[in-house]
Amino acid sequence: MDFLNASDQNLTSEELLNRMPSKILVSLTLSGLALMTTTINSLVIAAIIVTRKLHHPANYLICSLAVTDFLVAVLVMPFSIVYIVRESWIMGQVLCDIWLSVDIICCTCSILHLSAIALDRYRAITDAVEYARKRTPRHAGIMITIVWVISVFISMPPLFWRHQGTSRDDECVIKHDHIVSTIYSTFGAFYIPLVLILILYYKIYRAARTLYHKRQASRMIKEELNGQVFLESGEKSIKLVSTSYMLEKSLSDPSTDFDRIHSTVKSPRSELKHEKSWRRQKISGTRERKAATTLGLILGAFVICWLPFFVKELVVNVCEKCKISEEMSNFLAWLGYLNSLINPLIYTIFNEDFKKAFQKLVRCRY
């Protein structure tokens, strides 16, 4: 979210010329990422707005996440590109304050949205009946408002401490000399949400797996009951079971309670039902793997994109002798920004309704 800076004043014209190709490459690469992030998040927002089928409280959270990531792409990334390429801040301290404020608030808000979505999905799968009544547009709006308010409260202290010291006009950074402020902001913006997300998605996976198994067992029991036929005549009873027809003949006799004769006969119908049951088990297993893959992508992308940056933020503050290069600092910041590009892909690519909505938008069928 913040960058170190350098100056080109001590470089010769030849050195500047030699560095020009790399600067152009960096500029084009980062501009491409910013454009892709803007486009994809715009598609998600437009799809939810124009597609009636997507007007669901759960998707309102995804829409709000897309808006947040869109703001990162439009208001944060372009200034960062200029800062990296120029290697100094040339837009004044007022604009610097605005940029840092938007940067920290939007990135924090994007992360907290992931926590809100995880909480929403957890309650939807573990308390489906009760939560279905509470899962209204108003409820989604309250969750979104809470996320934004918390983001502002988490982001303000670092900006406040920035003005307690002196800063150069050609730099735009958050100082790493207030350990309390850094711990407060990093734990509030990342580490606490990370723990919450890990716990929630672990519980979601376990709950989803249990639900799949219960549904499969319920289907098998239902098939057994539907396939049973009872015929009674006086003291005789015949029981036919579709899975493997069993003939049970019970006769009353003074010397014995009953005599049983068992014979098993395979039938085409029983084999057909067995085949259907096997297919359902296969489908259930496929869905379980798909759910695990989706959760793995969500968690993996989040951790890979943001963990290195926030580890750096803590290490640089706690360890006075620990230094990090400008290039590495920029790379870690943009690795975090990359999460704003990945979010809309992960949260919509596995949803058929979103896929159809995207196709209609691209083909201009609205």
UniProtKB/Swiss-Prot annotation:
Signal peptide: none annotated. InterPro entries: 5HT1F_rcpt, 5HT_rcpt, GPCR_Rhodpsn, GPCR_Rhodpsn_7TM. It comes from the Eukaryota. Detected in hippocampus. GO terms for molecular function: G protein-coupled serotonin receptor activity; Gi/o-coupled serotonin receptor activity; serotonin binding; serotonin receptor activity. Serotonin binds at D103, C107. G-protein coupled receptor for 5-hydroxytryptamine (serotonin). Also functions as a receptor for various alkaloids and psychoactive substances. Ligand binding causes a conformation change that triggers signaling via guanine nucleotide-binding proteins (G proteins) and modulates the activity of downstream effectors, such as adenylate cyclase. HTR1F is coupled to G(i)/G(o) G alpha proteins and mediates inhibitory neurotransmission by inhibiting adenylate cyclase activity. This is 5-hydroxytryptamine receptor 1F. It comes from Mus musculus (Mouse). The gene is Htr1f.
